[in-house]
């Protein structure tokens, strides 16, 4: 999915990847038809845009998934424009118990919401 970043002329594209679990990688561009550049620190299994390697669960919540799958950033508005606010990133995704298996259409996926934690960023 591709989003316009609020207050900029920049676009963000996120794409789901798989190996060894589902996660998201990200690219940016100043033009939808232009060159897309991987977002540093958000472009691999080890350092994903969203994945088990950079997702933490709230205190007291036992980690219940390794998959960050079928996600979408929540938009900054309610019209057809896919604009996101970089200061209020929220990512709705589905995950499942890694011990579950069987028919894909019957897997016990459940929804969750990621929010950007800026507490570890330097001012």
Model-derived regions: residue spans:
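Carbohydrate-active catalytic/glycan-binding domains of CAZyme proteins
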Residues: 1-123
């Amino acid at each position: 999915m591709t989003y316009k970043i609020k207050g900029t002329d920049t676009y963000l594209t996120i794409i789901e990847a798989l190996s060894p679990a589902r996660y998201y990688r990200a690219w940016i561009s100043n033009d939808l038809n232009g060159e897309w550049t991987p977002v540093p620190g958000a472009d691999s299994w080890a350092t994903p845009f969203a994945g088990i390697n950079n997702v933490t669960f709230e205190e007291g919540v036992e980690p219940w998934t390794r998959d960050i799958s079928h996600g979408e950033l929540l938009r900054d508005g309610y019209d057809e424009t896919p604009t996101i606010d970089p200061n209020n990133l929220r990512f709705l995704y589905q995950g499942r118990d890694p011990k579950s298996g069987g028919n894909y259409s019957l897997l016990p996926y459940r929804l969750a919401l990621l929010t950007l934690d800026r507490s570890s960023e330097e001012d």
